């Protein structure tokens, strides 16, 4: 007998991909067996789907990279939708405002309706992950009270307190 050829070995690995790469269809670099490979991320690829790299596995087998989304400092993912929590000042919520909101495709202007409350969700159509249909970005308003840094700001809060009184919670 002589030496038997070793069987081809397909290799499987997980690949955490930045949301921006999934949104735009960017390339990412990975290290495989001491080499650096540049991989094109298909636009809108879903977690659990795989990218096959022919001949990059063990013994000339294929390498299958199972996609997962890397954690993002600002966004969460729900299916194809992107979730974002937007800090809003009390006067923006009460009076309405137009504010800049980050999305995976860059900042956009969002109109906050008057009399908005914390937890209200606003939809930016088509600003989620690509696909058929594309996802949306869901912006949840989080009303926060700014800290007081000087006498003018303290006086503004005191005027609000005097104007609203103690029974504003029941309104």
Residue ranges and their predicted role:
Residues 1-29, 58-59, 64, 164-171:
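Post-J-domain flank of DnaJ/Hsp40 co-chaperones
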Residues 10, 18-25, 31-50:
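Glycine/acidic-rich beta-strand-loop module
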